């Protein structure tokens, strides 16, 4: 299957946007430009160097440190809100996308369902897969790729009390007493 290509020659950053109103009022720019998560970025280094983005960040921080809450992410959004592109969802599939509370967006955004089933980059934005109590539906993908590195077989050491508490919490989900925060990916696979 052929992937659509995007030109970022005259842009600086590619990512997926956010709708949090507070970001725009704090950083003082219009919501129509959106806000991006800086955890996964594709950066045009030529643009970055030519426009001295690093110096701009330093100057902005010194002048407006009271506006900065999310460090580099806020700085980049405040400075580059007009100079970014958004890539397809599959290049930055975040934890939120797998949450039940977000599932209505799967119908709203073309490509999101495909991204959930076949992500190019998984961005674990909440509990990390190495956290014993992580219940991310693709937690095992992390360990699959970890096992392809020199750290093969490395797993976190979990104390007995944490194992018992987490086991009890998982039992609540398994028995249906508590509803999972995450979607069931099998439901999306069957609908294809």
Segments from the language model and where they lie:
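Short, small-residue-biased leader/transition segments that mark boundaries at the very start
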Residues: 3-8
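Conserved catalytic core of nucleotide-sugar-dependent glycosyltransferases
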Residues: 9-59
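A glycosyltransferase accessory/donor-loop signature
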Residues: 38, 43-192
């Amino acid at each position: 299957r052929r992937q659509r290509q995007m030109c970022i020659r005259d842009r600086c950053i590619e990512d997926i946007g956010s709708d949090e109103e507070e970001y725009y009022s704090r950083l003082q720019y219009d919501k129509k430009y959106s806000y991006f998560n800086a955890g996964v970025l594709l950066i045009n280094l030529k643009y970055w160097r030519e426009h001295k983005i690093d110096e701009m960040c330093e100057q902005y921080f010194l002048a407006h440190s009271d506006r900065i809450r999310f460090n580099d992410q806020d700085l980049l959004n405040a400075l580059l809100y007009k100079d970014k592109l958004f890539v397809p969802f599959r290049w930055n599939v975040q934890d939120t996308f797998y949450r039940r509370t977000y599932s209505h967006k799967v119908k709203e955004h073309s490509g999101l369902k495909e991204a959930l089933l076949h992500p190019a980059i998984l961005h674990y934005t909440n509990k990390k897969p190495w956290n014993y109590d992580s219940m991310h539906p693709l937690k095992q993908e992390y360990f699959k790729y970890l096992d392809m590195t020199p750290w093969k077989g490395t797993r976190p050491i979990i104390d007995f009390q944490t194992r018992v508490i987490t086991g009890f919490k998982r039992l609540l989900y398994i028995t249906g007493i508590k509803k999972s925060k995450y979607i069931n990916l099998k439901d999306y696979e069957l609908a294809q």
